[in-house]
Amino acid sequence: MGSLVRLAGAAIGYGRPLLRDLDLEVRSGDFLAVVGPNGGGKTTLLRTLLGSLPPLGGRREAAPSLRVGYVPQREAVDPLWPLSAGDVVLMGRVRRAGPGARLDDADRERARHALERVGLADLWHRTFHNLSGGQRQRTLIARALAAEPDLLALDEPTSGMDPAAELAAMDLLRDLHQGGLAVVMVSHRLEAVANYAARLAFADQGRGLWRVGTLDEMLRPEALSALYGRPVTVREENGRRFVYPEAGGGRAA
């Protein structure tokens, strides 16, 4: 697998470092999930990795002509514009073609294919604001896919979803990854990614903590206990892994 983007000895933050000495590489076919508490530096790390925020120290290296499909945590589509789901997905083709470029039938076909990949082929003409929350998120993922990216990057893609919608969204990302797409996502919920990602990174700028490893390495109870600062156990139920604080009180976030 080839390297897509890499941070070496990086310090990240806005004006002052939130986290230092970060070494992280994303390769073709990777599925990396960045987890940690709210305000822990996850989005800052993602923005630095994608190049929209320069590192304060160290360096960032990216493959030539790297194409990234980005799905932000919150997307504001002005309700005064009655955009259809298809219109939103076509924005991805505009980004791929560049400012001022005119879209042709081939662009529309690729956009339709992107919407089909996320299971919404029959909603091309549906007004975006009349979609459910889960359908809107899938449409935004389709917009990112329409740009034919090498890397799909998502910031809290399941935020605000109910458990069924979260599971469906993660199943979609698993399918896209298994189809050969590299995926990097940010989540504050470890359980959302524990059965999907190939690697986990943990970021908590409040404690200056940064760890990255394979899923098996990071989901060891002793590793999680050190990261979360309290005893944690991992159980497998019906083929899925769940994370629990040993003191009781339900699953860990």
Regions inferred by a protein language model and the residue ranges of each:
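Conserved ABC ATPase "signature" region
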Residues: 10, 90, 105-123
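Helix-to-loop junction immediately C-terminal to a conserved catalytic motif
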Residues: 50
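Conserved ABC ATPase signature
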Residues: 127-131, 135
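Catalytic Walker B motif of ABC-type/P-loop ATPase nucleotide-binding domains
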Residues: 152-155
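H-loop/switch region of ABC-family ATPase nucleotide-binding domains
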Residues: 187-188
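ABC ATPase nucleotide-binding domains
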Residues: 221-253
